Curated annotation (Swiss-Prot):
This is Phosphoribosylaminoimidazole-succinocarboxamide synthase. NCBIfam families: PRK13961.1, purC. It comes from Corynebacterium glutamicum (strain ATCC 13032 / DSM 20300 / JCM 1318 / BCRC 11384 / CCUG 27702 / LMG 3730 / NBRC 12168 / NCIMB 10025 / NRRL B-2784 / 534). The keyword Nucleotide-binding applies. Belongs to the SAICAR synthetase family. SUPFAM superfamilies: SAICAR synthase-like. Gene3D superfamilies: ATP-grasp fold, B domain, Phosphorylase Kinase, domain 1. Its EC number is 6.3.2.6. Keywords: ATP-binding, Ligase, Nucleotide-binding, Purine biosynthesis. The gene is purC. CDD domains: SAICAR_synt_Sc (cd01414). GO terms for biological process: 'de novo' IMP biosynthetic process. One of its GO terms (molecular function) is ATP binding.
């Protein structure tokens, strides 16, 4: 359900977030408890998910040395009380039309493409890689942004260059890989593998490239436990892969290619997903989720 914030104009709704206008230079980005999978927004919500996404984004925005769109603290007085802990005050940006995916390990759609072409988004990879193999170096595999219900489309770096120009495309790729490497080191030091992640960037009024949207959350990233990691099989995860696995497993009775809406998630899957999200935040940030604004009632 969308928060009714009478003091602000509602601008747009995404799969998970609601965007409100504060003034001509700032927006309020509110993370809901909605969860999406296979381009569907599920009917079932995950309690506290929006708070985890906001807390995780805040942690990495504060930690990673790169310009970002945050324009106030987590308890900024411009944040209405009813969404405190799940909202951020952000600068308005001219968002770039690409999802900036960085992969350090081979899994998901990247693995499917590799099996067909020995490459991912035009990046040639060595022979003999298997599910969950670590790549020799992280690779930049951009995708076009899709509307709700549509699929993001993986594209080559040449497409980004054609759209944005060589200089901006190189800046986007280099920034994405550098941020991934910094975050992967933080996660690994805490016993977590950052397998891949997705960034979104925009341009501010000064022409500066700025990191926007959410960053390095369990929604936008694949996080695996370092302990027990071994290439060749699907890894346990701290992200919404658990939901995807249930939906495509025998217990759901759902075919993702049927065109039908997914079923409601059972309580056990909801709670297990909530626990995984919270565990990811606590492991990586070193902070207790209960200490995050509005999380203990």
């Amino acid at each position: 359900m969308r928060p009714e914030l009478s003091q602000y104009k509602h601008l747009s709704a995404g799969k998970v977030r609601e965007i409100y206008e504060i003034d001509d230079k700032h927006i309020l980005m509110v993370a809901s408890d909605r969860i999406s999978a296979y381009d569907f927004i599920l009917d079932t919500e995950i309690p506290d998910k929006g708070r985890v996404l906001t807390a995780m984004s805040q942690f990495f925005f504060d930690t990673i040395d790169f310009p970002n769109h945050l324009a106030g603290p987590a308890d900024d007085p411009r944040i209405p009380e009813e969404v405190l802990g799940r909202a951020m005050v952000c600068k308005k940006l001219n968002m770039l039309p690409f999802e900036c995916v960085v992969r350090g390990y081979l899994t998901g759609s990247g693995l499917v493409e590799y099996k067909q072409t020995s490459s991912v988004c035009g990046v040639e990879l060595p022979e003999g890689l298997v599910e969950s193999s670590q790549l020799p170096e992280p690779i930049f595999t951009p995708a076009t942004k899709a509307d709700i219900g549509d699929h993001d489309i993986n594209v080559s770096f040449d497409v980004v260059e054609e759209r944005l120009g060589e200089a901006r495309a190189n800046q986007l790729r280099d920034a994405s890989i550098a941020i991934y490497k910094a975050a992967a080191e933080i996660a690994r030091d805490r016993g977590v593998i950052l397998a891949d992640t997705k960034f979104e960037f925009g341009i501010d009024e000064d022409g500066t490239l700025v990191l926007g949207d959410e960053v390095l959350t369990p929604d936008s990233s694949r996080y695996w436990p370092l302990e027990g990691y071994e290439a060749g099989s699907v890894q346990p995860s701290f992200d919404k892969q658990f939901v995807r696995n249930w939906l495509t497993g025998p217990k759901s009775g759902w075919d993702k290619d049927s065109g039908l809406e997914p079923p409601a998630l059972p309580g056990s899957v909801v709670e297990a997903t909530r626990e995984r999200y919270i565990e990811a935040y606590e492991l990586i940030s070193g902070q207790k989720f209960c200490q995050w604004i509005g999380s203990c009632v």
